Every structure is written in structure tokens, then in C-alpha cells.
């Protein structure tokens, strides 16, 4: 039975805990708001972190110290956090994603397939989340932007205002309100036609289930940095 430690006692942490309770092959080793100093976390096979960027480097250091598999879903990360993740991946298997839903992983793959024809369209990204989400644009929006334009060949325009002609750009728009679990759309706007790819999350359960799929994948893997693409399509010698 795979033993999971959850870091982060918020909405996502609670959703992961509920899903663990429904799985016969998983057990909750413990849960904490921050990385506990006690050795109890050492009993875990996998750490799942949905806490806060201020916690990310400490979580990475703990996983690296013990060689414990880490599933990292915290968003709003900066370059310093990403350096911590890369260092941890030298000592432990780390699955890092801004979104653990299967649908978003497929979405990302579809966008990568669109790169060869993306120059034929203007592109806009629209995302919506609940009123409590702090970072904007969402980590998932950034993930989708990287999938369609990995070399940053188009300027990102965050929101629109004022006057001026459209340039070589991708518009990015964030909506915050209510209890929206997460909605993401990428619009390809061409001459006399519009193609829209859209994903809507009905609840946080899809992210929790995806994180547990990632945990099963990471357990026993060699140290390295993995993505949901690796988890679902068997990358890095899966």
C-alpha cells in the first residue's frame, strides 16, 4: 500500500485526502500545513504538496534529503522556486505540474500539435477561477501558453486596454469570481473562422485524482523531473 503525506491543508489538500480514503491501494501517512520537523514524514512513500510558494523550497529540500518521491502542484512559482525543484529532482523523483487533470494534459498535447499552423491564427487565452485564487494568470494558463508558443515568439498581452493595432502577440485574460473550479479556453481566430479548445473543471476532484495518479507513477521511479505528459504517456523510460 502506497503511503502519502499531504503538505497543505487547504481546499486541494482536503480533496486529495478524501480521494485517498476512497482508494484501496493508498493510505494517508499524515498531513500538515507546512513541512513537519518530526521524522513522521519519513514513513511516507510520496509527498504531495498543494500548499504555498513560500513552502516550496522547504518541501523540495525535505524530499531530496530523504529521496522521497514528490508530487508538486503549487502554482504562482518564480525562478527561485524552479531552481529548488530542479535541485530536488537530482535526488528524488519529482512530478511537477500546474494542473493534474487528464483533460488538461490532453489539451496541452493538442496545442503542441497546433504549433505548425499557429501562425495562421491570432491566439487568445482566457481562464476563470474562484474568487480566492491569488495568482493570475493561472499556472495552467502559463502551461498552455508554453505548449503553443514554447519559444516566446509572440508577445504576451495581459488584459487589454487603450488603443492600438494588434501585433504579434497572444492575449491572456483572467477572470476571478464565485466558486469556479477552473475554466481554460484557447481561441484560434482566423479569416472567417474561429477554433476554440476549452476545458472546464466541475470540481477539484479531477486534480486530486490526477495527483494520486502521479503519485503512483512517481513511487519507485529514478530521480528526475517528470510532467503529467510523462505520467500519462510513459515518458522518461516509464
Regions found by a protein language model. Give the residues of each.
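Extreme N-terminal starter segment of soluble prokaryotic enzymes
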Residues: 1-4
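C-terminal substrate-binding/catalytic lobe of Rossmann-fold NAD(P)-dependent oxidoreductases
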Residues: 6-7, 11-44, 119-238
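Hydrophobic beta-strand scaffold residues
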Residues: 28, 70-71, 93-96
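Short, acidic/turn-prone active-site loops that include or flank metal/cofactor-
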Residues: 34-36, 75-78, 99-100
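Rossmann-like NAD(P)-binding element
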Residues: 41-58, 64, 69-74
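Rossmann-fold NAD(P)-binding glycine/threonine-rich loop
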Residues: 54, 61, 74-95, 105, ...
Amino acid at each position: 500500500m502506497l503511503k502519502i503525506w499531504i503538505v497543505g491543508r487547504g481546499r486541494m489538500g482536503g480533496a486529495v485526502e478524501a480521494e485517498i480514503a476512497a482508494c484501496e491501494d493508498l493510505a494517508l501517512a499524515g498531513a500538515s500545513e507546512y513541512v513537519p520537523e518530526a521524522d513522521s514524514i519519513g514513513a511516507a512513500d510520496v509527498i504531495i504538496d498543494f500548499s504555498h510558494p513560500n513552502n516550496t523550497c522547504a518541501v523540495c529540500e525535505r524530499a531530496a534529503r530523504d529521496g522521497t518521491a514528490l508530487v508538486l502542484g503549487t502554482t504562482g512559482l518564480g525562478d527561485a522556486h524552479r531552481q529548488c525543484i530542479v535541485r530536488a529532482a537530482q535526488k528524488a523523483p519529482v512530478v511537477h505540474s500546474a494542473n493534474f487533470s487528464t483533460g488538461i494534459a490532453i489539451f496541452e498535447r493538442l496545442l503542441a500539435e497546433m504549433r505548425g499552423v499557429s501562425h495562421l491564427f491570432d491566439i487568445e487565452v482566457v481562464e476563470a477561477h474562484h474568487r480566492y485564487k491569488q495568482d493570475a494568470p493561472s499556472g495552467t494558463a502559463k502551461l498552455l501558453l508554453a505548449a503553443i508558443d514554447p519559444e516566446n515568439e509572440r508577445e504576451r498581452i495581459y488584459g487589454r486596454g487603450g488603443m492600438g493595432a494588434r501585433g504579434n502577440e497572444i492575449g491572456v485574460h483572467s477572470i476571478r469570481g464565485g466558486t469556479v473550479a477552473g475554466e481554460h479556453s484557447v481561441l484560434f481566430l482566423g479569416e472567417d473562422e474561429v477554433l476554440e479548445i476549452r476545458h472546464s473543471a466541475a470540481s477539484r476532484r479531477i486534480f486530486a485524482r490526477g495527483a494520486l495518479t502521479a503519485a503512483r507513477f512517481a513511487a519507485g521511479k529514478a530521480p528526475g523531473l517528470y510532467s503529467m505528459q510523462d505520467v500519462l504517456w510513459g515518458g522518461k523510460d516509464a
